[in-house]
């Protein structure tokens, strides 16, 4: 295979020499070949025509550019709940985490704790460790504690169907975060509410960012975790949206479970760099952490931190993702979940359940964060929700 040392052409300064890059790329190629027999979970398009060729999608580009401009605004007012029951006192919650190494799961847990302090509730976090057995054990422990409510933190409730059934017998309401694809109540699995943005909106704006940023000419790689239904749905929608632009080609669809991301992502990225060279212009991942794990491979190849490839995370916008975006280190944008706000919403949904009220069903609008609109912040924390929820709860 002939390598295309695009990073040499785009890195300025005399210190970067083609010979040095080629030697680094050759090492990456050998490493990727050696590791090719190890665990892989990708499907890719063939070489095809270059995504930087003359074909584009003018109409789709204009639509994408306008949508991204709206999503980058930071001054939108709070449009979530403003009415509801006053705080029910003396309750306890158990937050069952898919894995606390998932920054989104961990960020929401902190939001739940913050809001629970306001209403005077107790919160216990149980880490499922990212494995089916661990999550089942964590759910079993949560039900055995007989709390007032249990949070399904970032995993498929169907994978713990026995424990979910036991919670139903004990009349323990369940509120999910990214537990199913749609926000609001769910009958199967039985959730009082599921807190999330609309996955269709997140997928669409992530793909539109690539279309707008590339002017409709890109070679993209999609990173996902197909073991999580929410993540799988998101990545499939991203791939579908990218396909609407004829000038964008999905080069590879990489299935890397989040618990394995730290070990697998670097070698998968090394392999992708050797396979696609300068055809790989953009990436999108269902979680920002993939780009933290990809950074060593990009550095080893001599890829510039500011891109290409230009990387966007389609969730969850944890502090490390913002740091990469703000410093131009292997991530250009993120579509962050308002993690703290969603933690507050989870507490509000439980309060509605305890009071006998219906769920609010609120879903936060999508937002795109780049170095140009974060003002150095390390999270997306929209304004107005704390005041609104405190007023609802009488706190």
Residue ranges and their predicted role:
Residues 34-37:
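C-terminal motif of bacterial Sec signal peptides marking the signal peptidase cleavage site
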Residues 48-111, 115, 124-137, 141, ...:
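Extracytoplasmic "Venus flytrap"
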Residues 39, 50-91, 338-395:
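Hinge/cleft segment of the Venus flytrap/periplasmic-binding protein
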Residues 51-57, 158, 162-201, 318-326, ...:
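Flexible loop/hinge segments that line or gate small-molecule binding clefts
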Residues 117-129, 191, 219-222, 242-262, ...:
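Short beta-strand elements in bilobed, periplasmic/extracellular small-molecule ligand-binding domains
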Residues 1-29:
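N-terminal export and membrane-targeting signals
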Residues 152-169, 238, 257-324:
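Hydrophobic alpha-helical
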Residues 93, 97, 112-114, 201-255, ...:
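An alpha-beta-alpha
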């Amino acid at each position: 295979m002939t390598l295309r040392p695009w990073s040499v052409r785009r890195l300025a300064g005399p210190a970067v020499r083609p010979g040095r890059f080629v030697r680094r790329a050759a090492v990456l190629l050998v490493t990727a070949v050696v590791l090719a027999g190890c665990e892989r979970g990708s499907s890719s398009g063939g070489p095809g025509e270059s995504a930087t060729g003359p074909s584009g999608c003018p109409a789709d580009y204009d639509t994408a550019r306008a949508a991204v401009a709206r999503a980058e605004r930071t001054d939108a007012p709070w449009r979530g709940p403003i009415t509801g029951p006053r705080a029910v006192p003396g309750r306890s919650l158990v937050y069952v985490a898919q894995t606390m190494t998932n920054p989104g799961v961990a960020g929401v847990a902190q939001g739940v704790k913050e809001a629970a302090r306001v209403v005077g509730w107790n919160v216990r976090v149980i880490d499922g460790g990212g494995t089916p057995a661990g999550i089942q054990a964590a759910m079993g422990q949560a039900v055995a504690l007989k709390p007032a409510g249990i949070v399904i933190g970032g995993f498929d409730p169907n994978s713990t169907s026995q424990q979910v059934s036991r919670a139903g017998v004990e009349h323990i309401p369940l509120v999910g975060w990214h537990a199913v694809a749609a926000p609001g109540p769910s009958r199967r699995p039985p959730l009082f509410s599921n807190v999330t943005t609309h996955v269709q909106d997140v997928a669409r704006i992530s793909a539109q960012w690539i279309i707008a940023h590339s002017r409709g000419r890109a070679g993209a790689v999609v990173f996902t975790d197909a073991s999580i239904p929410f993540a799988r749905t998101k990545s499939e929608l991203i791939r579908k949206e990218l396909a609407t632009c004829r000038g964008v080609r999905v080069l590879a669809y990489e299935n890397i479970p989040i618990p394995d991301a730290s070990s697998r992502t670097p070698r998968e990225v090394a392999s992708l760099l050797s396979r696609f060279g300068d055809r790989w212009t953009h990436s999108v991942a269902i979680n920002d952490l993939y780009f933290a794990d990809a950074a060593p491979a990009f550095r080893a190849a001599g890829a510039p931190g500011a891109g290409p490839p230009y990387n966007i995370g389609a969730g969850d916008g944890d502090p490390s993702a913002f740091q990469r975006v703000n410093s131009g280190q292997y991530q250009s944008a993120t579509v962050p979940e308002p993690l703290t706000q969603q933690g507050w919403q989870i507490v509000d949904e439980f309060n509605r359940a305890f009071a006998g009220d219906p769920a609010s069903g609120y879903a936060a609008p999508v937002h795109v964060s780049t170095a140009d609109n974060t003002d150095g912040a390390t999270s997306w924390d929209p304004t107005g929700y704390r005041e609104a929820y405190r007023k609802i709860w009488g706190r």
